């Protein structure tokens, strides 16, 4: 693979990667979506997993998966910030619109900006946990300012053999150790690990083994250094892999091989 771009240079000694969480179906990519996919593939990203946010996400996700069936896989679910009093009707209307989802996500609890619908968020999350069990699919979990409530909900279903990802993990060592108790779950690590003021590198080194990590971008959000502050995209994933290689003192190829194997096993792709 010729190493023309900075991302490709970071990737030259590495193997195939999977972006387990990317929103490249969103309007931020309308002007250059095909180029975004091309750059990512050239950088070594072999799969793009597309989390569902709400009903409006579905047409774009489906169109992208139909255009790039060899690369793109869709999820189904309702993001906690989109949970309102009518959450049950919303989920009932959208559930069967995503064909062959690889996960239930992006779901969870978020009390950061507004907890008006706190009870509804918890009810919707538990409903979607049950759906994931019924469908034998992993969960992709979003959590912000809600760790005790979210882990309480998961504990009520622990006997169901839950599995999935704690998406965009950026918590403390104590949080990581609590989440490590859920043996079917791994940690989604993205651009935040490259930020100079982030303590995530030390947390991972202290508390999370490499085989419990998968790569993600959360594009268009949270671009890694050296692209911080700009639109994120999957071709930047090598910068995350390179940082993890430093943290775990292994080669980039080993990071890619282990995280890819973990993602393939979790999502059956």
Question: What is the role of each PLM region?
Answer:
Residues 2-269:
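Mid-domain alpha/beta scaffold segments of enzyme catalytic cores
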């Amino acid at each position: 693979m010729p190493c023309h771009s900075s991302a490709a240079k970071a990737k030259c000694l590495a193997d195939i990667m999977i972006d387990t969480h990317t929103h490249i179906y969103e309007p931020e990519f309308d002007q250059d979506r095909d180029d975004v996919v091309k750059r990512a593939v050239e950088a070594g990203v072999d799969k793009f997993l597309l989390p569902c946010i709400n009903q409006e996400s579905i047409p774009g996700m489906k169109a992208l998966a139909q255009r790039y069936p060899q690369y793109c896989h869709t999820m189904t679910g309702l993001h906690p910030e989109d949970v309102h009093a009518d959450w049950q009707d919303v989920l009932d209307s959208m559930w069967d619109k995503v064909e062959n989802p690889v996960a239930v996500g992006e779901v969870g609890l978020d009390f950061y900006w507004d907890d008006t619908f706190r009870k509804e968020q918890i009810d919707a999350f538990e409903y979607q946990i049950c759906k994931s069990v019924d469908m034998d699919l992993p969960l992709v979990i979003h959590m912000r300012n809600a760790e005790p409530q979210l882990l309480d909900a998961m504990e009520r279903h622990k006997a169901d053999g839950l599995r999935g990802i704690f998406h965009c993990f950026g918590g403390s060592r104590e949080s990581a150790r609590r989440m490590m108790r859920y043996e079917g779950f791994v940690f989604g690590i993205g651009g935040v690990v490259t930020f100079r003021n982030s303590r995530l590198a030390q947390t991972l080194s202290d508390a999370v083994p490499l085989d419990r990590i998968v790569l993600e971008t959360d594009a268009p959000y949270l671009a890694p250094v050296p692209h911080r502050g700009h639109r994120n995209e999957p071709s930047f994933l090598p910068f995350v892999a390179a940082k993890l290689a430093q943290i775990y003192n292994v080669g980039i190829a080993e990071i890619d091989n282990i995280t890819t194997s973990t993602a393939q096993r979790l999502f059956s792709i």
